[in-house]
Each structure stands twice: as C-alpha cells, then as structure tokens.
C-alpha cells in the first residue's frame, strides 16, 4: 500500500511539473500578425529569439485594415499573439471590439505623451509617420507652376487632372488624407469636406485602391501623368535612398499645409487569448528599445517613437509638419465609416 501511495505521489508530482512547464513550452513561439509592409532585419529578430530562447513567426495579413479584420474574426481564439501595425485610423474599432489585453510597458517612459494611442495601454505606440501630398519637382518646373499652399487650390483649373489619391475604404494613406480633409474643412460649414471632394471629382481627381499603384504607376515621377499624389512626408527621403545615383536633393517634395497633414501612429497590442502572453510582453519592451527602433526607419520609412532612437542620415530629406490635422482617435473611431460612406457616394458614384 505504501509503495502504491509513493508511486501515485510520484505520478502526481510529474504531472504537476509538466503542467507547470507547459506554459513555458507554449511560450517558446511568438506569432506576430502584421501588415504586408512590416520589415525588420533578421538579425534583430534573431537577437530577441536568442535572448528569450524563442522562435518568432511573422504572419502577414494584407494591409493594416485587413489585418485588423482578421484579428476581429479570430477574437478570443487568435492565430497570433500580437497585432503589429494597428494605427490611429483603426484604433477606435479595435478598442470597441475588445480584442486586446492591456499591458503597460516599462519602456513607455522613453515615449513622448503625444504618441499615446490609448490611456488604458491596450495598444502601445511603436512608430509614426505623416501622410500628405507629394509633388514631382521636374513636372511642376516644366509646367511653370508652384506647389499648392492650400487644399482649396486643388479644385482650381491649374490642378485639373493632376492629382491622384487612394480610396479611403481600402487604403490607409487614403483614409488618412480623407480624415485630414475633414479636419481641415469641417463637416457643417458653408463649404465642408464633401464640397471639397465634389470639386475634386469635377476636377478629374484620380482614385486608386492602393498606395503602390498610385505612387508607382500614376505619379509623374514614376512615369505617370499626375504630379500630385497622396503619400508620406518621408517619401522624398526614400527617393534619395533608392536612387541609383547620389543625389543632393530629392526629385520630389512635400506639400505641408497647416491642418491638412495627418499624423499616423502605429502600435502593437497583445491579442486576447494569446498563447504566449509573457513573451508578447517582452517583445513589446524589445520593440520600444533603441535596437529595434533604429532598425526600421530605412525599411518602412517611418519614425521611431523612442526619443533616444536615431534616424538614418538620409531622413534629412524628409520634413516634419508643424501643424498636422487636429482630430482625436475617438472621433475617428466614431465617424470613420460615416465619412467613408459619404466620400464614396460623392466621389465614386
């Protein structure tokens, strides 16, 4: 009887040990769902893996909006542990759906308050960029025209058939630009954002589904016939970076109109039901460290939120708007679909 008791006790101890280790074994793989533009050096990911005895799996799920939709569909039983790339245009929907667990990173003291996405720390800011108009310098020089200094000018004859934008229903920069026009013109004034878009339609604005098609096909710098495109304030710097010859200035420029640029902040959140929560928390801390923060600017052409992180030298060809659109994530979350529906009726139908 004593032998049986000792044997049973041994079995219980073994089972208890296995159970206690089970979470650790599960914690060895971290799955990060993100957008297709996500790009971090393999050696940086490897550093995290080696430091944590773990494997990182990057799960790309389309653009930021598509990744969010997938995370919502998987709510409570996610295929990933983290969602990277949720920005302030989609933040409201993500918080309403309650797909994230809260986590306050110890590294947040390195992040200025203006990049805070939500006070409950369900989404942690990682990077930021500015969405605005870019212009083709050579085209404007040849045409003898100056870059616009107000959005109202875009509805004039000088800019007829010269602007390409992205569809805000399916494009992140397209949505950011739409939101900027809402902030700039308002919704209830004598001339509001929808009046502006009606005038743009009458002025033959071109609408494309994605940034790549608009920038690399229709933008005149890349062979198209439109010298104005919705892009990013870092795009002129990217033109210098990718040039086959050394440049002393960018062939493109930024149109930085007060109140008409959009500060886009990307963040990361731990998905509810994640298998590897402790590892996910460590990755968020790692993503805010300078090693990670200094790796992505020359790959994703966005700025680090860590105030101690440095940007590449070619970022001097980028510009930082002094007065981006003043509109809160809460208002965006509340009215985003309304704005998109109204825009679609005015511009596409």
Locate the predicted segments by residue:
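C-terminal motif of bacterial Sec signal peptides marking the signal peptidase cleavage site
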Residues: 17-20
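Early extracytoplasmic/lumenal segment of secretory-pathway proteins
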Residues: 22-93, 222, 349
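Pocket-flanking alpha-helical
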Residues: 42, 64-100, 108-119, 217, ...
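A structural signal for short loop-to-beta-strand junctions that line the ligand-binding cleft
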Residues: 78-83, 101-138, 152, 162-168
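Periplasmic solute-binding protein
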Residues: 88-99, 118-146, 174-184, 263-269
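Short beta-strand->loop
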Residues: 100-109, 123-124, 152-155, 233, ...
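Ligand-binding pocket segment of bilobal, Venus flytrap-like solute-binding proteins
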Residues: 173-255, 259-260
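Mature extracytoplasmic/periplasmic domains
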Residues: 266, 271-327
């Amino acid at each position: 009887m004593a032998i049986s008791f000792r044997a049973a006790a041994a079995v219980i101890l073994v089972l208890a040990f296995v159970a206690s280790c089970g979470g650790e074994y599960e914690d060895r793989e971290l799955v990060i769902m993100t957008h297709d533009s996500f790009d971090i050096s393999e050696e940086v990911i490897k550093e995290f893996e080696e430091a944590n005895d773990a494997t990182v799996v990057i799960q790309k799920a389309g653009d930021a909006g598509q990744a969010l939709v997938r995370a919502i569909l998987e709510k409570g039983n996610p295929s990933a542990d983290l969602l990277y790339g949720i920005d302030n245009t989609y933040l409201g929907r993500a918080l309403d759906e309650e797909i994230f667990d809260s986590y306050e990173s110890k590294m947040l003291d390195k992040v200025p308050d203006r990049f805070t996405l939500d006070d409950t720390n369900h989404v942690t800011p990682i990077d930021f960029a500015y969405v605005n108009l870019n212009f083709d310098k050579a085209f404007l020089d040849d045409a003898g025209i100056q870059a616009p200094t107000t959005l109202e000018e875009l509805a004039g004859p000088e800019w007829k058939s010269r602007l390409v934008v992205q569809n805000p229903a399916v494009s992140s920069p397209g949505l950011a630009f739409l939101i900027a026009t809402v902030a700039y013109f308002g919704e209830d004034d004598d001339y509001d954002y929808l009046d502006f878009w009606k005038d743009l339609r009458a002025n033959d604005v071109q609408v494309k589904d994605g940034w790549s098609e608009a920038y690399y096909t229709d933008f005149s710098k890349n062979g198209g016939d439109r010298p104005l495109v919705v892009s990013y304030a870092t795009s002129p710097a990217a033109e210098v970076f990718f040039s086959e010859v050394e440049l002393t200035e960018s062939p493109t420029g930024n149109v930085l109109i007060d109140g008409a640029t959009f500060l886009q902040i990307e963040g990361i959140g731990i998905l509810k039901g994640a298998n590897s929560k402790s590892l996910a928390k460590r990755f968020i801390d790692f993503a805010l460290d300078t090693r990670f923060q200094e790796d992505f600017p020359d790959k994703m052409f966005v700025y680090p939120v860590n105030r101690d992180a440095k940007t590449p030298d070619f970022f001097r060809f980028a510009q930082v708007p002094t007065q981006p659109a003043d509109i809160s994530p809460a208002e965006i979350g509340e009215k985003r679909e309304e704005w998109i529906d109204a825009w679609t009726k005015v511009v596409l139908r």
